[in-house]
């Protein structure tokens, strides 16, 4: 007899896991504590809400996260399928209308006949086949139970979200539409800065007031989502190699490359909202308004959402998990999402996809499977379970996680294409073996 699967958390990983389990013909109880209990970062009651950027990053197969998306599409991913449905222009990236995206996923999950939604907080680890996908903002009571079960200290870092601006308040005479190196459609509004403007902006940023952290929390930032003010403090030129990099963004009015450029990315389908790319911040709201209005074109900008910052927790997965996302201590317990140390929206959903496939197999009396390292799904699972536990940090999908190709290819683009083609070929064999 097929057993049911209990999934805790309906974020990106939990939603994907529920979809995979139910589509394998296994009943699911999906627990989500919102709206009964809220988190500091979520704004809505929808599943798979995006709390940071609205971009799911690169879509090309010369980009590891692009390969990961394609692998997920081929496994009927609800997250990538819904992202494709609700995409907004973003050059070579896959960005979405954040509200439509989470609404689409919520509707699909709620209408699935094998998924039962339960809006309540879980404070202990249940019996039976369970996937815990409660994310970086796991409630205190469940966090404590997970730590007690795992017998090891959790880690944490801070994740910060960028401000969102009303497009109608941007001075369009001072900005220009362009994607870096003219890749894809011209999808970004670019705010050029002279050296003098940049220096004044940097000075204001490093001296702006931030929201103080609670005394018992130690600052620990993941490099991929570092607050802009922390980046600015690392040196006057640091931002010029990060979110303010001018390379490939020549100003069409002058034909020259500005000293610095700040990019604004479309945040909704109506193109009425734009976020400041890479400007995650923990500045006080009044300071955000003052400092970010120094950006050319944003002198009178209205902020529909200020940048916010919240704590993210993740486990010491190399010590605790198998590459199937099963607990080493209990075979019928799976973990998925950012709490496992995968970093990024797509990676979180991907871990939920694998945990879901394997939980469904277990429910049907079949053996869970490890995806080969030649696939992006497999390379991520391998990394988080084989890295050195002592120095374990969250990781994005990247080509450095894959095994080397049998032949050496000097050209980087050709090498990445070869890795991508191998990944999809190997995945096709895995899918065939699952049927």
Curated annotation (Swiss-Prot):
GO cellular component term, pick one: cytosol
Transferase is among the record's keywords: yes
EC class: transferase
Gene3D superfamilies noted in UniProt: FAD/NAD(P)-binding domain
EC number: 2.1.1.74
One MF term in the entry's GO annotations: flavin adenine dinucleotide binding
Protein name: Methylenetetrahydrofolate--tRNA-(uracil-5-)-methyltransferase TrmFO
Organism in which the protein naturally occurs: Enterococcus faecalis (strain ATCC 700802 / V583)
């Amino acid at each position: 007899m097929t057993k049911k699967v209990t999934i805790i958390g309906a974020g990106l990983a939990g939603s994907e896991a529920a979809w995979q389990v139910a589509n394998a013909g296994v009943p699911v109880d999906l627990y989500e504590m919102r709206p009964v209990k809220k988190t500091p970062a979520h704004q809505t009651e929808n599943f798979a809400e995006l709390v940071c950027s609205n971009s799911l990053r690169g879509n090309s197969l010369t980009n590891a996260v692009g390969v990961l998306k394609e692998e997920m599409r081929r496994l009927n991913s609800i997250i990538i399928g819904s992202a494709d449905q609700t995409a907004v222009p973003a050059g070579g990236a896959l960005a979405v209308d954040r509200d439509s995206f989470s609404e689409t996923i919520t509707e699909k999950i709620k209408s699935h006949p094998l998924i039962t939604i339960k809006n309540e907080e879980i404070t202990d680890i249940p019996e039976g086949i369970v996937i815990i996908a409660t994310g970086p903002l796991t409630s205190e009571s469940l966090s404590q139970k997970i730590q007690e079960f795992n017998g090891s200290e959790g880690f944490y870092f801070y994740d910060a979200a960028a401000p969102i601006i009303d497009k109608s308040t941007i001075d369009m005479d001072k900005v220009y539409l362009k994607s870096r190196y003219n890749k894809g459609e011209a999808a970004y509004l670019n705010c050029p800065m002279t050296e003098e403007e940049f220096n004044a902006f940097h000075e204001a940023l490093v001296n702006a007031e931030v929201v103080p952290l609670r005394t018992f929390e130690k600052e620990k930032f993941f490099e991929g989502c570092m607050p802009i003010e922390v980046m600015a403090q690392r040196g006057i030129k640091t931002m010029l190699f990060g979110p303010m990099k001018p390379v490939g963004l020549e100003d069409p009015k002058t034909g020259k490359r500005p000293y610095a450029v700040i990019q604004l990315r479309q945040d909704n389908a109506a193109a009425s909202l734009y976020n400041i790319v890479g400007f995650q911040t923990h500045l006080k709201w009044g300071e955000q308004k003052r400092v970010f209005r120094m950006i050319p074109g944003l002198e009178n900008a209205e902020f529909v959402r200020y940048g916010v910052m919240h704590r993210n927790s993740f486990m010491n997965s190399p010590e605790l998990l198998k590459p199937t996302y099963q607990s080493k201590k209990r075979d019928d317990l799976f973990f998925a999402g950012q709490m496992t140390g995968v970093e990024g929206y797509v990676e979180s959903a991907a871990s939920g996809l694998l945990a879901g496939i394997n939980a469904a197999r277990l429910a049907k009396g079949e053996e869970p499977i490890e995806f080969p390292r030649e696939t992006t799904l497999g390379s991520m699972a391998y990394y988080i379970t084989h890295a050195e536990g002592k120095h374990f940090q969250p990781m994005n999908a990247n080509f450095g996680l894959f095994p080397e190709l049998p032949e050496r290819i000097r050209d980087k683009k050709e090498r990445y294409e070869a890795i991508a083609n191998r990944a999809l070929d190997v995945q096709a064999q895995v899918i065939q073996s699952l049927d």
